[in-house]
Regions:
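Active-site-adjacent segment of FAD-dependent monooxygenases/related oxidoreductases
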Residues: 43, 48-118
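Beta1/beta-strand and adjacent pyrophosphate-binding region of the FAD-binding site
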Residues: 1-14, 30
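Glycine-rich FAD pyrophosphate-binding loop
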Residues: 23-43
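Short alpha-helical segment within the catalytic ATP-binding CA
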Residues: 16-17, 49
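Accessory recognition modules or surfaces
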Residues: 2-3, 39-43, 47
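Conserved functional loop/turn residues at catalytic and ligand-binding sites
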Residues: 10, 26, 59
Length: 119
């Protein structure tokens, strides 16, 4: 039986990110995922500049950027259309070297993370 340094259960965005970070640092990684393919609809839709730094470390930003949108803000409305929270986001690069807010399609991210693991 082969031994692994790390076992990760689930290959969603968190599991895929962790697997890439461990592999990048020389750990052998066993990934357990019950689904044959990723779920085709989005669930997570937002991340910030700190997460983009992690993706930069992994090495997926060049390919993944074309699937992201710089988020200018979010308005939350109630059932009558009244704005209950307006959350504008600055559109300038932060000290982390990235914009403070991005929108994305989760299946695109999962595809990029899995592609990187195959290399």
């Amino acid at each position: 039986m082969k031994e692994y340094d790390v076992t990760i259960v689930g290959l969603g965005p968190t599991g895929g990110t962790l697997a890439n970070l461990f592999a990048l640092n020389g750990f052998s990684v066993l990934i357990l995922e019950r689904e044959k393919s990723f779920y085709p609809l989005p669930r997570a839709v937002h991340f910030d500049d700190e997460v983009m730094r992690v993706f930069q470390t992994i090495g997926i930003t060049n390919d993944f950027l074309k699937y992201t949108i710089i988020n200018k803000g979010t308005k939350f409305v109630n059932s009558k259309g009244k704005v209950i929270l307006d959350w504008p986001r600055p559109r300038k690069v932060t000290e982390n070297g990235w914009y403070p807010s991005y929108r994305f399609n989760q299946p695109d991210l999962e595809r990029q993370l899995r592609k990187k693991l195959m290399k």
